[in-house]
């Protein structure tokens, strides 16, 4: 794994609707917590919640960000997200196109 790759991360979160997804994406990018957020509409989630199997249409966020912003990014996402327990998973980046990784890492520039 390259040093640049280990300095960036991809985060996964799901939102109940487009308005929420756009609001979170806009805030994370505007506040320099993420370099890019891709909104994937049309996801169907099946999960267990409070003893029941639930189904929901959701919008998935793929958040690309420097690893150093994670604590602030998590705090901000939790402030903006309407779910009691929002999904927020950090996926390790083991490699990628070097120029793209450098761009992700330089979110503050």
Question: How should each PLM-predicted stretch be described?
Answer:
Residues 1-109:
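Positively charged, small/polar-rich N-terminal and surface patches that mediate targeting and assembly
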């Amino acid at each position: 794994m390259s040093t640049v790759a280990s300095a960036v991360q991809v985060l996964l979160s799901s939102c109940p609707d487009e308005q929420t997804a756009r609001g979170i994406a806009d805030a994370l990018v505007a506040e320099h917590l993420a370099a890019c957020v891709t909104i994937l509409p049309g996801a169907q989630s099946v999960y267990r919640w409070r003893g029941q199997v639930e189904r929901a249409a959701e919008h998935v966020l793929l958040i690309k960000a420097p690893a150093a912003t994670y604590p602030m990014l998590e705090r901000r996402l939790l402030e903006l997200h309407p779910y009691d327990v929002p999904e927020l998973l950090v996926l390790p980046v083991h490699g990628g196109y070097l120029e793209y990784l450098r761009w992700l890492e330089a979110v503050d520039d």
